[in-house]
C-alpha cells in the first residue's frame, strides 16, 4: 500500500491554472498534489551572443525554491552567492525539454525565459515544473499570436514529465516525497504528447533494477504523461 493510498498507476490530483500572473506574457500555477510551482514565461528581444544573426530564437529556463517550500527553511541561493548543482541540472533539463516543443526558426530572433519557482515541495518538483512550463510557454505564444508577432505555427508538440519508481517492490507512478525517500528505484520521464521520449533519468537507490522493471516504469510514465497532456490541452483551450 502506498502512503497516499493511491493505486500504482494513479497520479496525485493535478491542476494547471493558466494566466495567473498579470505582468508575464505567459504563466501557470501547477499543482501535483502538495507540490506547487509558479511558472512564468517572459518574451525578450535578446539572444545569447552565439545565436545572434542566425535567424532563430531560444528558450531558456531558471528554477528555484522558496525558502519555506520545504519542511525546514532552505537558505536562498542568491544569499549563498551561487546555485547548487541540483538547481543547475534541473533548469537545464527544463530548458532542453521545452526547446524540443518549439520551432526555434519560427520563433524568430527572440528569447523566451521560463522561470519556475517552487512554492511548496512534496516530491516531483522538476516534473511538475516541466509540465507547467509548457502551459506557460503556450500561453506566451498565444500572447504573441494576438499581436501578430508570429508568421507560422511555433508549437510543435506538447511536453510533459512524470516520475515513477519501485516502492516496496511495486512499480508506481508520480512519487510524492514519502515514497521518493523510500523507493528502491526512482526515475523521471520527459515525453511528448505522442509518446516520444525526450529524456529519462533513472537511479537505483537500493537494489539494481531489471530491464523488465524499467519497461514497467516506462509504461506507467506513458500513461501518466498522456493524462497530463490532456490536462495541458484543457488548460490552454
UniProtKB/Swiss-Prot annotation:
Enumerate the residues binding phosphate. Answer: 86, 124-126
HAMAP family (UniProt xref): RNase_PH (MF_00564)
Q: Which PROSITE patterns match?
A: RIBONUCLEASE_PH
Gene Ontology biological process terms in this record: rRNA catabolic process; rRNA processing; tRNA processing
Task: Print the keywords alphabetically.
Answer: Nucleotidyltransferase, RNA-binding, rRNA processing, Transferase, tRNA processing, tRNA-binding
A molecular function annotated in GO for this UniProt entry is: 3'-5'-RNA exonuclease activity
Source species of the chain: Bradyrhizobium sp. (strain BTAi1 / ATCC BAA-1182)
Subunit structure of this chain's protein:
Homohexameric ring arranged as a trimer of dimers.
Q: Which InterPro entries has this protein been placed in?
A: ExoRNase_PH_dom1 (IPR001247), ExoRNase_PH_dom2 (IPR015847), ExoRNase_PH_dom2_sf (IPR036345), PNPase/RNase_PH_dom_sf (IPR027408), Ribosomal_Su5_D2-typ_SF (IPR020568), RNase_PH (IPR050080), RNase_PH_bac-type (IPR002381), RNase_PH_CS (IPR018336)
Which Cys-Cys disulfides exist here? none
The catalytic activity of this protein is classed by the Enzyme Commission as 2.7.7.56
* Top-level EC class as recorded in UniProt: transferase
- So which domain of life are we looking at? Bacteria
Q: Which Pfam families match?
A: RNase_PH, RNase_PH_C
* Function statement: Phosphorolytic 3'-5' exoribonuclease that plays an important role in tRNA 3'-end maturation. Removes nucleotide residues following the 3'-CCA terminus of tRNAs; can also add nucleotides to the ends of RNA molecules by using nucleoside diphosphates as substrates, but this may not be physiologically important. Probably plays a role in initiation of 16S rRNA degradation (leading to ribosome degradation) during starvation.
As its record notes, the protein acts as a catalyst of: tRNA(n+1) + phosphate = tRNA(n) + a ribonucleoside 5'-diphosphate
Q: What protein name is recorded for this chain? A: Ribonuclease PH
Family stated for the protein in its record: Belongs to the RNase PH family.
Amino acid at each position: 500500500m502506498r502512503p497516499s493510498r493511491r493505486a500504482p498507476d494513479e497520479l496525485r490530483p493535478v491542476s494547471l491554472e493558466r494566466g495567473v500572473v498579470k505582468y508575464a506574457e505567459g504563466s501557470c500555477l501547477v499543482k501535483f498534489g502538495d507540490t506547487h510551482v509558479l511558472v512564468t514565461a517572459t518574451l525578450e528581444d535578446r539572444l545569447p551572443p552565439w545565436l545572434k544573426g542566425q535567424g532563430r530564437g531560444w528558450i531558456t529556463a531558471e528554477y528555484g525554491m522558496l525558502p519555506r517550500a520545504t519542511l525546514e527553511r532552505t537558505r536562498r541561493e542568491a544569499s549563498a552567492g551561487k546555485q547548487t548543482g541540483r538547481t543547475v541540472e534541473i533548469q537545464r533539463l527544463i530548458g532542453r525539454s521545452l526547446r524540443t516543443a518549439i520551432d526555434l526558426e519560427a520563433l524568430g530572433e527572440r528569447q523566451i525565459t521560463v522561470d519556475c519557482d517552487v512554492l511548496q515541495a512534496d516530491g516531483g518538483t522538476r516534473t511538475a515544473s516541466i509540465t507547467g512550463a509548457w502551459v506557460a510557454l503556450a500561453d506566451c505564444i498565444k500572447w504573441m499570436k494576438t499581436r501578430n508577432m508570429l508568421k507560422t505555427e511555433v508549437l510543435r508538440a506538447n511536453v510533459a514529465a512524470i516520475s515513477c519508481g519501485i516502492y516496496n517492490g511495486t512499480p508506481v507512478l508520480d512519487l510524492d516525497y514519502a515514497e521518493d525517500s523510500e523507493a528502491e528505484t526512482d526515475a523521471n520521464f520527459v515525453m511528448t504528447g505522442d509518446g516520444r521520449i525526450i529524456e529519462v533519468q533513472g537511479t537505483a537507490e537500493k537494489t539494481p533494477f531489471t530491464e523488465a522493471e524499467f519497461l514497467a516504469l516506462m509504461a506507467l510514465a506513458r500513461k501518466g504523461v498522456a493524462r497530463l497532456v490532456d490536462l495541458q490541452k484543457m488548460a490552454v483551450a
